[in-house]
Regions:
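Aspartic protease
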Residues: 1-139
């Protein structure tokens, strides 16, 4: 088992992980060609590895299989994108939300191909332009 942060991205139709994560897990990888469309490129072909991953929440209460996760050298998010407890504590309407801290990078991007992972369980709506938040099975 490896601990990492996951970026839940409903704007992506595919899930991705870092090459480094697949290596640390010793995951079985299969070569494939990936067609990526972004705001700056359309149908850009790229060699990738596809893996099957099983993810669980920090307490191990919920586990879901992600059957087609594409491996990339890096993901378009950084450690600075990870919310911290001090961020949440700034707003009273977010009271009761606990963000666990782990010593890890963001090595998994979960797209809308994993709808159960993205499914909202609780929504804290934005007030006066400050952040809103969504709780899922995974936090």
């Amino acid at each position: 088992m490896v601990e990492t942060y996951a970026f839940l991205d409903p704007g992506s139709n595919t899930s991705f992980c870092t090459d480094q994560l697949t290596e640390r897990l010793g995951a079985t990888r299969m070569k494939t060609t990936l067609s990526l469309t972004t705001t700056s490129h359309k149908d850009a072909k790229s060699q990738s590895l596809v893996v099957c991953l099983e993810i669980s929440d920090p307490c191990g209460n919920h586990t879901i299989e992600l059957p087609n996760v594409f491996s990339r050298p890096s993901l378009p998010v950084t450690i600075d994108d990870i919310p911290r407890q001090t961020d949440v504590d700034r707003w009273a309407y977010l009271n009761g939300i606990h963000i666990p801290h782990i010593d890890a990078e963001i090595e998994l991007l979960v797209g809308n191909d994993a709808t159960k992972v993205l499914e909202p369980k609780e929504i804290r709506e934005s007030k006066d332009g400050v952040p809103s938040t969504v709780r899922t099975l995974f936090g």
